[in-house]
Amino acid sequence: MPEPRPPAPNDIRLRKILDDTLLAPRWPEGFFMRGFEAADALALHALLTAVFDDGADGPFDQWWPRISGDADFDPALCFLVIDAKGRLAGAALCWTRAFVKDLAVHLDARGKGIAEALMRHAFAVFQARGAAHVDLKTNTVENAAAVRLYERLGMIEVDWAG
C-alpha cells in the first residue's frame, strides 16, 4: 500500500517514537474506553462526519465498505470513548501499520483529555504489537489545537516518505 501523501499544502506527517517513556492513558471521569464492534460503525461514521464536516468520507454506505475492506483495517485498532449516557464521545481509528487514520472527539466532550487518552492508548497498543513508532497526518491550519496536542505528546514532524 502506498504511503499517505499530503493532499493540502498545510498537511504534515507526525511521528511518535515508542520508547520506555510512554505514559498510561487517564480517562476523564464519566468516560470509558471500549473496543469497536461492527454495530458501532454507523455511530463512528456520524462522529467523524460531525467532527470533520468536510464530506470527504461520503455517505455511510460508501464509507463503511471502504474502511472495513481496507487491508490495514483491524477492528481491534478502533478505540471508542463512551460517556456516562452511553453516547460515543470520541474515537481513534488506526491502521495496522501503526498509523492513526482518524482521531475525533465530539464537540460536547472536548477539553476533558479524551484525545490525549486515546492517543496514549494507541501508543501503548502499537508498542505491545512491536511497532517502533506511530504516525499520523494532520493539517497545521485547520487543526492547530490538535497539532499542539501531538507536540505535547512528543510527536515530531517527519518526511512524507517516512
Q: What are these model-derived regions, one by one?
A:
Residues L107, L136-A146:
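Conserved beta-strand-loop-alpha-helix junction that forms the acyl-donor binding cleft
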Residues F126-T138:
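Conserved GNAT acetyl-CoA-binding A-motif
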Residues M1-E29, G162:
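Acyl-donor-binding surface of acyltransferase catalytic domains
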Residues V105, G111-A128, V147-R152:
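Conserved acetyl-CoA-binding loop-helix of GNAT-fold acetyltransferases
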Residues G55-H106:
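A conserved beta-strand-loop-helix scaffold within acyl/acetyltransferase catalytic domains
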Residues F32-A46:
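A short beta-loop-alpha structural element at the N-terminal edge
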Residues T21, T96, E157:
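Long, contiguous binding/interaction regions
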Residues F36, L103-V105, N139:
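Hydrophobic adenine-recognition pocket in adenosine-nucleotide-binding enzymes
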